[in-house]
């Protein structure tokens, strides 16, 4: 037999580019045709091998002992004899010839193997999902389990060859379209035994094994969490923060901090997020002087069904202090996290969360710029994007609007900022809008209903950061004044003309009509003028509320629907 067997036009792990696969007594290797990193697998690491039909011909699936599942696609049917002979002689492994279920049924039996979840129909695999491709799983209903797949960040999609070992767990990134979620409907009950999960429908004639009967969907969910290592071992949890309010996505979550990831545990959804996915870390004080916001920029973004959340926004109380001791050995703390983490914390919760996130993720904490202070001495300016109210923060190198929709703009990408008035004369005198136009036709962002008092602080910040801006409000003011003057001239001329035409009416003596009731005029107005109430002082009161909201804002829950009437602010205890 030859010392090596080579195969051309082979695709590794759904890679875009083919490569050359070579088998030898020491192991196997794959190198992309266009050049790049070579993938190798030692012969001692090969546990089993399977041969089956696949997308580009025939596929050789290798179940390794420590590297999960390796897929080699693109073989011809004639290659099976050479492959099976090489595996038998060099690795002592029989290549199993497997046939897939082609009936198209969407019901079958799930089997948890060592490296993947298999969905079998009539004892044949319909599809398999490697555990390394599963990023998260949730109980979507009483009998329904949602499985989410790993996504590739926009910036790293082409960072490595698709067959690279550094891309392990991101096979779907090779294609322009990728499956992001799959749901399993699992009715009934089941019992977990040493041999696996035994459902109530299994009829194998064996004696019933001891085990606690529970909901089949719950047992499937817990088993998948364990196999896919979504929920890490409790002993590996460095720190836990309970019942933390999140504005985006909305809800309260427990935060478990691990070595390379953190987990959000809510009543309905659980999320596992790698620290490597954190691209930006913001610490932003709210205007109510009672809360602070911690904002994490994520890439790839967090997913909840069809909704994507590129920013994670949590809200913490400034006066809430906690005492926390890290669940970490002194050796690990000294060797890996020296000068990054402390063994014990006893200070406000927002500082503890920030310090631990910074120590474990290694990300720099970004805070509001010292070059901007609002008219009322705050770091954020109250405004809105369409119907969503929030706070706009001015940082040294960027702008960010939170909580919903969280919007991030880098200053270096800003072409010009336009300050303008929108609306009638009353609203124009109290608020204004700013439109941020981006360079190279990247679009624009409009922030509305900014208090008129913030104009000067904003202009000073734009000048300090050398941001080009236009103030269109001065032109609007001149136009309003000119219109008012013209209107006064017309009214005075009308009065003169009117008195000249009255004739003998000027000689009439004015007297009080004793039968006249003052309320009758308003009654007539209400009957014939549908806008009688809205045209009076009510609009002025509403505008006063709008302009004063930034002053009196205390415990405002900004993630609620803005269409609802504003509630009275709460006073912290």
Curated annotation (Swiss-Prot):
CDD domains according to UniProt: PH1_SSRP1-like, PH2_SSRP1-like, PH_TFIIH
Gene3D superfamilies xrefs: 2.30.29.150, Pleckstrin-homology domain (PH domain)/Phosphotyrosine-binding domain (PTB), Structure-specific recognition protein (SSRP1)
UniProt KW Transcription regulation keyword: yes
GO biological process terms, semicolon-separated: DNA repair; DNA replication-dependent chromatin assembly; DNA-templated DNA replication; nucleosome organization; pericentric heterochromatin formation; positive regulation of RNA polymerase II transcription preinitiation complex assembly; silent mating-type cassette heterochromatin formation; subtelomeric heterochromatin formation
Classification via SUPFAM superfamilies: PH domain-like (SSF50729)
GO cellular component terms, semicolon-separated: chromosome, telomeric region; FACT complex
Gene Ontology terms, MF aspect: DNA binding; histone binding; nucleosome binding
Biased composition (Acidic residues): 486-495, 506-530, 541-562
Positions of region (Disordered): 153-174, 485-573
Keywords: Chromosome, DNA damage, DNA repair, DNA replication, Nucleus, Transcription, Transcription regulation
Localization annotation: Nucleus; Chromosome
Biased composition (Basic and acidic residues): 496-505
Keyword DNA damage: yes
Origin superkingdom: Eukaryota
Subunit structure and binding partners: Forms a stable heterodimer with spt16. The spt16-pob3 dimer weakly associates with multiple molecules of nhp6 to form the FACT complex.
PANTHER family noted in UniProt: FACT COMPLEX SUBUNIT SSRP1 (PTHR45849:SF1)
Family: Belongs to the SSRP1 family.
Protein role: Component of the FACT complex, a general chromatin factor that acts to reorganize nucleosomes. The FACT complex is involved in multiple processes that require DNA as a template such as mRNA elongation, DNA replication and DNA repair. During transcription elongation the FACT complex acts as a histone chaperone that both destabilizes and restores nucleosomal structure.
Comment field (misc): In contrast to the orthologous protein in animals and plants, this protein does not contain a HMG box DNA-binding domain. This function may instead be provided by the HMG box of the associated nhp6 protein in the FACT complex of fungi.
Protein's name according to its UniProt entry: FACT complex subunit pob3
Organism: Aspergillus fumigatus (strain ATCC MYA-4609 / CBS 101355 / FGSC A1100 / Af293) (Neosartorya fumigata)
